[in-house]
Amino acid sequence: WRRSGDRDARKGPARAGAGDGGEAIFQAEFSHAGTLTVVSDRSGWWNLYQLRDRGAVPVCPRAEEFGGPQWVFGLSRDAFVSGGTMLCAHGVGGQSRLGRLDLQTGALEDLQLPYTSFDGLRVEGQRACFVGAGPVRPSAVVALDLGTNRCRELRLGSTLEFDPSHLVVPQAFEFESVDGRRSHAW
């Protein structure tokens, strides 16, 4: 529910902005400009929407997930950078990328990072922090310089050393299951 009016929602009548009629939403937050942004499953995919006077408007509609399983506590898959820009994790088949999204145009530029999992994403000034991991990289708390797109691993989840060439990189695939539905596996 939200109220039209100011950012603090103190003015105007309350109305449902998203999340009714079987729709699930999460990570509702206001942009720096005061626009409420949510991740919604209304399209069948977890996509980003902004709630405006004319209703929920898709920001970057794609057949990809910008959300994640709701049984994970503290889930944070996107964060506002400045102005009309945000960082967001997105992907399909369990492999995510981190991208810089222009909220006005919907243009999404993926950052070239060595991770395929991004959790706990936060932004402060010109630095983003997240827990990143990949098929041959253990989980790590990572600081990303938003000016240079360079990462620094602040703390590794494991200090075990191994030769990455001894690991098999999992490949995501889809197959048809019951009633013509698509299932995902590794």
Language-model regions: role of each:
Residues 1-186:
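Peripheral, non-catalytic segments that deliver or gate enzyme domains
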